[in-house]
Amino acid sequence: MSFSSAVKNELCRVETDRSSSLFELAAAARISGLIKVVNANEINLRLVTENAAFARRIFSQIKDLYGINAEISIRRSPKLKKNIVYIIVLTSSKGLMRILEDINIKVSEKVEYIPYARCMRKKEYRKAYLRGAFLASGSMSDPEKTYHLEITCHNMALATEVSDLMDSFKLHSKVTKRKGNYVVYLKEGENIVDFLNIIGAHSALLELENIRILKEMRNNVNRIVNCETANLQKTVDASVRQVENINYIKEHLGFDKLPENLREIAKMRLAYSDATLKELGEMLNPPLGKSGVNHRLRKLDKIAESLRNMKGEL
């Protein structure tokens, strides 16, 4: 089961009062409902979902709120033949007009979605509307791979409505157009966690938080390993360069021409090419700190560079 399906199944177990049920139903019908004007006397509304729990929830809400038994049928998905889709149909002969009036959808020659200001009055109403919107038309990526949550709307006005509701909780949503639809989305993990909390998906929230913590730990470990690897590579490269320069000095100048302190560190570096600066310093008599060792080795680098310049090798 996908993470998105698990979230929806959890949301379908959230208990709601009559008002919250109405706002859930309103969101589902407004955002993903397909309204068809058959003729002057007949209108129908279709809700299509692949989630069986959501289909049962919508069917129950319609019956509890309006005493209507909606028609429900099961089909194979036209896109993915192995998937089942559930189709809930309401008609004007079975009380659809009353529902449309309650959820601010006006049907005459065309379908008009009137701004649904009622759901802005209380926080619980806004939560219920967002829960219904996600159940009807939302999806979420696998958080192991990336953080992305979206709700698809079939017009800009509805997308703006959903975005404004999200932003009333300071979620910083964005809207984009995709294949003729308008998608409201969240990209930040923290905002997605907050959204799941708002709509009541608390188990999914905890799972997402655990995934975020593990990903952050892995990223921190990788950063440390990469940093240590880079530092080790720098140390190795410096040691190789130092050994090459010291051998060049030995061959073209001779150690006897070097001051005692440089001769000592040159021999020590050749003898212990894989030693760190700290280890080299501790082997000297008297011991020398890292900066002192580094200073002497840099002097040897400069001597080698001068010799190469004199011989025209640079």
UniProtKB/Swiss-Prot annotation:
Family: Belongs to the WhiA family.
Any Pfam family the entry gives: HTH_WhiA
Annotated GO biological process: cell division; regulation of sporulation
Keyword RNA-binding: no
Alphabetical list of NCBIfam families matching this protein: DNA_bind_WhiA
Name used for this protein in its record: Probable cell division protein WhiA
DNA-binding residue intervals: 276-309
Function of the protein: Involved in cell division and chromosome segregation.
Domain of life: Bacteria
MF annotations from Gene Ontology: DNA binding
Alphabetical keyword list: Cell cycle, Cell division, DNA-binding
